[in-house]
Structures are given as C-alpha cells and as structure tokens.
Amino acid sequence: MSSIEDRVKKIVVEQLGVKEEEVTGEASFVDDLGADSLDTVELVMALEEEFECEIPDEEAEKITTVQQAVDYIKKHLEG
C-alpha cells in the first residue's frame, strides 16, 4: 500500500494537472501549483474520497500546502 504522502501527491497531480516533481511538501496549491478556488474544493473532495474521511470546510480552508494536507490526513486517520 502506498504511503499517505504518495497518495496525496498522486491526487494533487491528477486534480491539478501538474508534474509530480512540482508537488513538494512546501508547495502551495494556489501560489505554486496554480489551483483556483474550484480546484481546491475538488482537491478536498478527492482527498475525502481517497481516505474515506470528511474534512469540514473550516478545516479545508486551513489546508493550503501539500504537507498540510498530508498532516491533516495522518492526524485524522491515526487519531
């Protein structure tokens, strides 16, 4: 099974149409990867589906980088 990081990166690549090497932990979805508000909503929905969890809107707004998404998923899967 792939790591959480790998699964998150794969989703980001698929959702935003960016190259895998562009998807680093520090990469901002909006500033570095060119996501708009619709992209970020779709990204959160894809993460929810992949990891079978619910990310409340107020939490989703705080997830602005790849690493923040990974950390959020880890915290909620393990917690």
From Swiss-Prot:
InterPro entries: ACP (IPR003231), ACP-like_sf (IPR036736), PP-bd_ACP (IPR009081), Ppantetheine_attach_site (IPR006162). Belongs to the acyl carrier protein (ACP) family. One of its GO terms (cellular component) is cytosol. One of its GO terms (biological process) is lipid A biosynthetic process. Pfam families: PP-binding. It comes from Halorhodospira halophila (strain DSM 244 / SL1). One of its GO terms (molecular function) is acyl carrier activity. Pathway: Lipid metabolism; fatty acid biosynthesis. It is found in: Cytoplasm. 4'-phosphopantetheine is transferred from CoA to a specific serine of apo-ACP by AcpS. This modification is essential for activity because fatty acids are bound in thioester linkage to the sulfhydryl of the prosthetic group. This is Acyl carrier protein. The modification O-(pantetheine 4'-phosphoryl)serine is found at residue 37. Carrier of the growing fatty acid chain in fatty acid biosynthesis. It comes from the Bacteria. PANTHER family: ACYL CARRIER PROTEIN, CARRIER DOMAIN-CONTAINING PROTEIN. Keywords: Cytoplasm, Fatty acid biosynthesis, Fatty acid metabolism, Lipid biosynthesis, Lipid metabolism, Phosphopantetheine, Phosphoprotein. PROSITE patterns: CARRIER (PS50075), PHOSPHOPANTETHEINE (PS00012).
